[in-house]
Amino acid sequence: MRLPLLLASLLIAGSSLLALADDSATRIGAAADGDWRSDAPGVRRKLTAQDMPAPGATRSAANPSWVVARPEGAWPKAPAGFAVSLFASGLDQPRVVRVAPNGDAFVAESAAGRVTVFTAADGAAKAADKSVFADGLRRPFGIAFSPPGADPHYIYVAETDRVVRFPYRAGDKRAAGPAEVVVAALPAGAGHWTRDLAFSAGGRTLFVSVGSASNAADAMPGAPPEGVAAFAAKHALGAAWGAEENRADVLAFDPDGGGMKVFATGLRNCSGLAIQPQTAALWCVVNERDSLGDDLPPDYATSVKPGAFYGWPWFYIGGHEDPRLAGRRADLAASVTVPDVLIQAHSAPLGVTFYDGAQFPADYRGDAFVALHGSWNRAKRTGYKVVRLIFKNGAPTGEYEDFLTGFVADDASVWGRPVDVAVAHDGALLVTDDAGGAVWRVAYTGR
């Protein structure tokens, strides 16, 4: 009888060890808050609202990174079985990258005011050539093809203060005509200047993200001229006023630019938009506010629900009130939508895409990739990497995993800053890097 008991004990002990190993595989709560030294492909993290510290638990840090030339031998690090190549270099602030149905990659070079198109055969580690598709643009950022699908007729480009479109046929390397203004006036001026674009799955709605004019409604009056109640009765749930009116929002338009509606509010800087193929839901990644401490509040990725209010400026991550605006909109506390995936504070997520390719291992399909531009308001540097959001049956688990790291040179300097991600025609992943003026390509080789 002793042998079966011994075997049972060993099985129980083994199961306990396996459970412990599984628990340690994902860094949860405070353990998920590290710095660049703890980053490595495969490291998983999960944050919840219950993990957040109190406002001011640490001093607000001013810790910007110095951008340096890529050191000799430095290269992005990907998981085992993946190979990283320099797809394109010598770009001027490459930001958003979007891939046309024929495989051409369109990149917004925001500082240069142009959109550049790169061509490459499937499987090619490097772009074969590049052409300027359109120039003379006002800080272009978002790019979208319309109608969605195999045969788009237009390329839409979001400038900082308007949306334009160009006629397009597959293979065009230069716009066939001048820019046609679709949305003549987006909220612009101070604060976040990037504007991203996405079309609904059926192509009937054009979504435009507009970031806030300030960190936490710094210049917004305490109340609108007509009073809060009267203003709220005529505007979307959680709408801001003054210099922040129609900012920190996702706006919705008809494809021709008419029919403007506020789709969702309280998204401080929804810098990247994407449609989830499995559910047709709109997703965005959000840079949350600064100056509340090293680990507060988390940035996030979330599905964007019509009519939802995500908290800014009065609240963050549900009904957690910003102490700088205490009591100003207590009526909204129970109406805040909690985002789906929390990301370490100050990581600065800028771009998001869902993996619908066939090149990566099967468990990647349906997951999302997010480009983290990197922190400045944190004593210990974080971000500066690409992470993978884990989904199960189309729903986020709340976990995310380091996928592409290695862009930090040391405590003071970085040589790369990921901005956006896109799935190439052959299933590889393209990553823009505005610090290095580059586009990186990550391919699965199995070796």
Task: Annotate each PLM feature.
Residues 86-91, 132-136, 182-189, 262-266, ...:
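Surface loop/turn motifs at the tips and blade-to-blade linkers of beta-strand repeat domains
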Residues 139-140, 161-200, 228, 232-235:
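Asp-box/WD-like beta-propeller blade repeats and closely related beta-sheet repeat scaffolds
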Residues 97, 143, 197, 270-273, ...:
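Hydrophobic core register within WD40 beta-propeller blades
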Residues 25-79, 152, 194, 212-261, ...:
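Beta-propeller domain segments
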Residues 90, 100, 146-148, 200, ...:
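Structural WD40 beta-propeller signal
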Residues 105-107, 153-157, 205-208, 282-284, ...:
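Hydrophobic beta-strand segments that make up the repeating blades of beta-propeller
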Residues 114-148:
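Blade-loop segments of beta-propeller domains
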